[in-house]
Amino acid sequence: MAKISAVNRNAKRARMAGRDKAKRIALKNIIMDRTLPVEDRFEASMKLAELPRNGSRVRVRLRCKLTGRARANYRKFELCRVALRDLASSGQIPGMVKSSW
């Protein structure tokens, strides 16, 4: 199990990223628009820099829904490899069977 504080911090970052998503996209579009004057683009980049760092999507870590483990996660199941193996071996994931050839 991961530390509860790490899981909560990641959840907070995910909330902030969702909240600030529209603002970040709008500012990035202004910054990348070459038809606008340099002053406007620079002002938009300053506003983007003023936004909190934790509001960025890249700071959110993919974590296991059961254990909170941050490594070896499968996006499709939102589980880490350890939890996925336990659930699959007990038959709790529909359609997943142990391979044999």
From Swiss-Prot:
Matching PROSITE patterns: RIBOSOMAL_S14
What is one GO biological process annotated to this record?
A: translation
What Gene3D superfamilies does this protein map onto?
1.10.287.1480
Keyword Ribonucleoprotein found = yes
The GO terms this record gives for MF are: rRNA binding; structural constituent of ribosome
Alphabetic keyword roster: Ribonucleoprotein, Ribosomal protein, RNA-binding, rRNA-binding
Recorded hits in Pfam families, A to Z, give: Ribosomal_S14
Query: What assembly does the database describe for this protein?
Result: Part of the 30S ribosomal subunit. Contacts proteins S3 and S10.
Please state which protein family the record places this protein in: Belongs to the universal ribosomal protein uS14 family.
Q: What does this protein do?
A: Binds 16S rRNA, required for the assembly of 30S particles and may also be responsible for determining the conformation of the 16S rRNA at the A site.
Check the record and name the NCBIfam families matching this protein.
Answer: PRK08881.1
In its UniProt entry, what is this protein called? Small ribosomal subunit protein uS14
Q: Which organism is it from?
A: Gluconacetobacter diazotrophicus (strain ATCC 49037 / DSM 5601 / CCUG 37298 / CIP 103539 / LMG 7603 / PAl5)
